Amino acid sequence: MLFSQQQVISDTRIWLGHNREDRQLIAIEDPYTLSLDELILSKIETAAQRVLMDASWSMLAPGTPVRTRLAWRDSPGRGMAVLPLPDDFMRLLSVRLSDWQRPARIITADNPSYCWQSSPFAGVRGNPSRPVAVITSYPSGMVAELYSSMAGPSVRLVEAQYVPCPRLIDGFINLPEPLYHDVVALVAQLTMQS
């Protein structure tokens, strides 16, 4: 849901106990001092990113579909697939290939089980009954390495949803409605720490 930056600023002021009628807060005209509204505005994206990274999957679903093509390390449909992630990627919610029995367990490259994914033994690495998606960085950008498939060239991407990095665009920010008040509370906390 889209929320205007003015709405976030207003709700944060209420959270802080500072409203527009407080003349002491808006009478300061020092050019080297940030106004309360400027401080709040500078914290919105940071607070939104923190809240969305910590939120449970159910609070974020449904995500934004990943609309890129799979690349294969070896032959198509066999072994590891590479799914390039969008530039605004922040968090992967779900990914599933057509030969997998369920969505993948999502880990990052610093997870100890990442080294197991290169094992020559199918029971150790991700497989169609226990798929694993590893979020990592390539020179071309962020990718999800998908372990692994065995069905051949017919394998396709069935589902891939992600959470985009929240940004203020034209004075609006897109946030899940259930998390809005958590974002406002964190904006207020970050503003008080400034």
PLM regions: where:
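Glycine-enriched, solvent-exposed interface loops adjoining structured elements
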Residues: 1-126, 139, 144, 149-194
